[in-house]
């Protein structure tokens, strides 16, 4: 071996596993719980309302799964599903990302709105879907929520919204932030007309969504373990220079500090909503007592 070879650095290469090898769980067939790491058959998990059979973790639901689990069979009618986002600010790559999400989710936007019955009681229902642009709120999401509220007001039925969002959609800038005021104003008018508002916050409900319509219900509920907050935990800790409680920004923390009315298990959600709708319907108090 020459002197030159002794002092020369040997090249080291990192081995990158193939896509097939890197998959711990077969896609679509099995699902791993992000909390306890238990691997479950996806179809069994879906039957259990996507609640982990081992630790009770509430896994993410898409809008269709949520509606199917809540609304009486054959009663849901979607409206304004044709509305789609454009690119008002000319944000690079935004149209391509929207199109990719449309293909992946079969949705036009991050929310589905419609009307249906829960335990025989009519309501207008809005369900956000975090699989589309992380459920972010752009101008179309705000418009669909506002139109749904106005529909509930015109029909004199309750308005129920399930939130799941990373906050305002940055690609739409100020137009996205305007939806906070727009949706809040619509809820205010609906409330002044004696309309019933039920908000259910699911994981995650953050940013501008948590700071606007998500927190404006007559009843504010959440699912167990849901992340709910405005700014991120790290940002808050760096700002106040203090450590935050372990359960900070969880549904249970908010309930303990009076910011929620209840934390409701997914398996009990339909029955709970049905009882509240019955209570607020004509003769509802008598019906509630009889049940």
Swiss-Prot record:
Task: Identify the residues that bind Zn(2+).
Answer: 33, 36, 52, 55
Give the first-level EC class, as a single word. Answer: transferase
Catalytic activity line of the entry: N(6)-carboxybiotinyl-L-lysyl-[protein] + acetyl-CoA = N(6)-biotinyl-L-lysyl-[protein] + malonyl-CoA
- Cofactors, names only: Zn(2+)
GO cellular component annotations of the record: acetyl-CoA carboxylase complex
Q: What does the UniProt cofactor note say?
A: Binds 1 zinc ion per subunit.
Residue stretches in coiled coil: none
Question: Which keywords label this protein?
Answer: ATP-binding, Cytoplasm, Fatty acid biosynthesis, Fatty acid metabolism, Lipid biosynthesis, Lipid metabolism, Metal-binding, Nucleotide-binding, Transferase, Zinc, Zinc-finger
Q: What EC number(s) has UniProt assigned to this enzyme?
A: 2.1.3.15
The question of whether Metal-binding is a record keyword is answered with: yes
Q: Which GO terms describe its molecular function?
A: acetyl-CoA carboxylase activity; ATP binding; carboxyl- or carbamoyltransferase activity; zinc ion binding
Q: What is this protein called?
A: Acetyl-coenzyme A carboxylase carboxyl transferase subunit beta
The gene behind this protein is accD
């Amino acid at each position: 071996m020459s002197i030159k070879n002794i002092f020369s650095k040997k090249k080291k290469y990192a081995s990158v596993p193939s896509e097939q090898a890197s998959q711990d769980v077969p896609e679509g067939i099995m699902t791993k719980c992000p909390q306890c790491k238990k691997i479950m058959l996806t179809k069994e998990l879906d039957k259990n309302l996507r609640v982990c059979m081992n630790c009770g973790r509430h896994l993410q639901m898409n809008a269709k799964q949520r509606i199917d689990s809540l609304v009486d069979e054959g009663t849901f009618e979607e409206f304004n599903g044709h509305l789609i986002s454009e690119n008002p600010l000319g944000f690079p790559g935004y149209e391509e990302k929207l199109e990719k999400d449309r293909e992946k989710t079969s949705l036009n936007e991050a929310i589905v709105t419609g009307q249906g019955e829960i335990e025989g009681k009519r309501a207008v229902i809005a369900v956000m879907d975090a699989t589309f642009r992380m459920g972010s709120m752009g101008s179309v999401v705000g418009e669909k929520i506002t139109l749904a509220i106005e529909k509930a007001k015109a029909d004199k039925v309750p308005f129920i919204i399930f939130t799941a969002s990373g906050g305002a959609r940055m690609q739409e800038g100020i137009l996205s932030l305007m939806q906070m005021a727009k949706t809040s104003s619509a809820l205010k008018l609906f409330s002044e007309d004696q309309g019933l508002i039920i908000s259910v916050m699911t994981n995650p409900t953050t940013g501008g969504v948590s700071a606007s319509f998500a927190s404006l219900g007559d009843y504010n509920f959440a699912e167990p373990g849901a992340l709910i907050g405005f700014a991120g935990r790290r940002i808050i800790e760096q700002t106040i220079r203090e450590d935050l409680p372990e359960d900070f920004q969880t549904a249970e923390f908010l309930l303990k500090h009076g910011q929620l009315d209840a934390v409701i298990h997914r398996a009990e959600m339909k029955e709970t909503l049905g009882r509240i709708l019955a209570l607020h319907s004509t003769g509802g108090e008598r019906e509630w007592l009889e049940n």
